[in-house]
Amino acid sequence: YHLDLPWVPGGFLGVDVFFVLSGFLITTLVVEEVERTGRLSYRQFYLRRARRLLPALWLLLASVSVTALLFFREEIVELRGDVLAALLYVSNWWYIAADVSYFEFTGRPPVLQHLWSLAVEEQFYLVWPVIVVAAMAAGRRRVRRVALVLAVLSTLAMAVLSIRYGYPVPNDPSRVYFGTDTHAMGLLLGAALATAWSPWRRYDPATAWVRRSFVGRRFRVLITDVLGAAALAGVVWFFLNVGEFSDFLYRGGFLVLSAVTAALIAALAHPAGLLGRAMAVQPLRYLGERSYGIYLWHWPVFMVTRPGFELGVDGWPVHLLRVGLTLGIAELSYRYVETPIRHGAIGRLMSRARARTPDGRQAATRLVSGVLALALVAWAIGLAMVRADPPAGRSATSVSVGAGASSASAGQAEAAPAARPDVSSGDEMRAAGSVVLPPPAPPPGPTEPAPEPPAEPKPEPAPGRVDPSQVSAFGDSVIFGAVDYLRDRG
C-alpha cells in the first residue's frame, strides 16, 4: 500500500490482520496464565511486553530524531510532538487532535504516522488484561462474551460516526480509522477467538494417529484447512478490491475482515493442519520473526526515499531499493537490539556491574538510570534548541508568493531567488492546503531609453491588486481560511 501499487488498493488492511493476531496472542497468554496459576503477574506481563517492544521503538525514535536534526531541520517542530506521543503510545489521538489525515496529504506526511497502530495496541494491552482477569472468575465464556460485545460496539461507533459526518466521502475518515474506540474490533475478535480455540492443548502428535477417533479427527482437521484456505482467499480479496474510501469498510467492513482473519488464524494455529505447515516455510518464518521491525522502519525509510523528491527515478528499481533498505535495517535491529535485550542482555550487564563494585546493586542502578537520564535530557535539549523554518502548524493554510508570473524568463527567476520558497527543490508543506500568488514584478534595472513609447499602452493592474486569473488555490476545507486574503488582493 505504501509503495503506491495500484493493484493493491487494500494494502493498508494488513494492520487489521495484525490487530486480530495481536488480540489472539495476548489473550491466549493471559487466559492460560490465569488458568495455570489462578492470577496474572501484571509486573511480569508488562515487563515482557516492554522487552519485546520498547528497544526497537526507542532505536527508531532516536534514529529519526538524529536524522531530522541533520537533514530535515524544518520538520523538527512537528517531530517533537510526534516523538512524545510515540513514547506515551498516544500517537493515534495525537494525530486526531492535530487533524492529520492518514489517506490524504500535501508534501511529506509525518514520519512517525504509522505508529498510530502501535498506540492502539498498547492502549488495548493496558486495559484488556485487567478485564480478562476480572471476567475469568466466571470462565472463558464470560471473556468471550465481553470481547464480542465490545467488538460490536466498536463497529457500531465507527458506522454511526461515518454516517453522521460523511465518512469516508465527502469527508476524510481518519478520525474513525485512528480512534481506539472505533477501530478495536480486530483486537477484540482475536481475543474472542483465543477463549474458544486452543487446539494445541488437546493435540498430542505422538498418539494422534492411533486413537480410535482417527478418522473423525482427520476429517475435522481437513475441514479446518478448507475453511482456512477460504479465509485466506477472502483476506486476499479484501486487499485487491477494497480501498480506503469504500463505504462498506466503515459500515461493518472492518468487522467482516476481522472475522475472516480470525478464521484464517484458527486454521493456522492447528498443529495438525496442512495450511499451517505450508505457511511455516522458512522465508515466511523469517519475515514473521522480524515483522515488528519491518513495520517500524518501512514508513520512515519510504518517507526519505520518495520517487520524484529525494530520488529522481521511479519504478521497480526504487521499490526494490526501499524494500531492501527496510529489510536490512530491520535485520540489524532484530539481531543486535531486539534479540539480545529480549534474552536478558541488560540483566547480564547489570550483574557484571554489581559484581565489580562494593555496593553493586545501587551502583548498577545508578549507572543505568544516569545514562538514560543523560540521554533523555540531551535529546530534549537538542530538540528544544532547534527551530524549524517556518514553524507553521499542520492545519494552517500556507500563503506563498512566487518569484514571477508564468511569463517571466529564466534569467528573471534566477535574479531574485530569495523572493519565493524553494518549492521546486522539494521543500515540503505539511499544511492542509496552500495558496500560490504571483508577487509584484521585480524592480527594473537600468535600461536603454526606447525610441518611442507605444501609442496606446495596455492598462496594468492597480498597485496591490492581482489578476484573479493568476491565482491558483490547492487544498480542501481549510482553504477557506485564505478567502479574505484573496479578496483583499483582488
Q: How does the language model describe each region?
A:
Residues 162-163, 215-219, 241-242, 309-317, ...:
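Extracellular/periplasmic envelope-modification machinery, especially enzymes
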